[in-house]
């Protein structure tokens, strides 16, 4: 049976990376028991940042679609919604942003319009990094065996934030002018010299 050489299996150099751990640069470690109890932040070592303040353009957009949702929505002809058991999937930061801010819009047509307008707002959004942190934590949460919450519910639970699904409060002056626009009345306008 002769002379058998034992060959060593080696890993090619392009698949090896070297790194060094510096004790002064270690992130403070969080107690893993606390993470297991709360199950809010998955593998994060620090807490999530607070919900960012919406920009003026975003506030105007949400106000417009919130009012349209309350005023023009006609639910006739719709089938009763079935509680579909959807599989929770990892998301990106724009999807998180869009789903959070469009959660109260129930009209499908308005949701489609709002989605494209939110995409325009997203390009100018200064808090994209905050939304990226939210999605990273949410995607880690999805790795847990008992993950059952969608992104909006998970974020609200993680930030101890309660959702107010009522119409946003506006000043009486702007509300009356908005109602006049929607009332269908036509006023005559005369130019006087």
UniProtKB/Swiss-Prot annotation:
InterPro entries, from UniProt? ALPHA1_Saccharomycetales, MATalpha_HMGbox
| Induction comment from the UniProt entry of this chain | Induced by HBR1 in response to hemoglobin and growth signals.
Chief localization class? nucleus
Q: Which keywords describe this protein according to UniProt?
A: Activator, DNA-binding, Nucleus, Transcription, Transcription regulation
**Zinc-finger keyword on record:** no
* GO annotation, biological process: positive regulation of mating-type specific transcription, DNA-templated
A family per Pfam: MATalpha_HMGbox
Q: Which residues bind DNA?
A: 86-142
Locations listed in the record: Nucleus
Molecular function terms from GO? DNA binding, bending; DNA-binding transcription factor activity; sequence-specific DNA binding
Q: One cellular component GO annotation, for this chain's record?
A: nucleus
Q: Miscellaneous notes for this chain?
A: The C.albicans mating-type-like (MTL) locus contains, in addition to the genes for the regulatory proteins (MTLA1, MTLA2, MTLALPHA1 and MTLALPHA2), a and alpha idiomorphs of a phosphatidylinositol kinase (PIKA and PIKALPHA), a poly(A) polymerase (PAPA and PAPALPHA) and an oxysterol binding protein-like protein (OBPA and OBPALPHA). MTLALPHA1 is not represented in the genomic sequence of strain SC5314 because that haploid assembly includes the mating type a allele of this locus.
Q: Which family does it belong to?
A: Belongs to the MATALPHA1 family.
Described by its record, this protein's role is as follows: Mating type proteins are sequence specific DNA-binding proteins that act as master switches in yeast differentiation by controlling gene expression in a cell type-specific fashion. Transcriptional activator that induces the transcription of alpha-specific mating genes.
Q: Spell out the protein name for this chain.
A: Mating-type-like protein ALPHA1
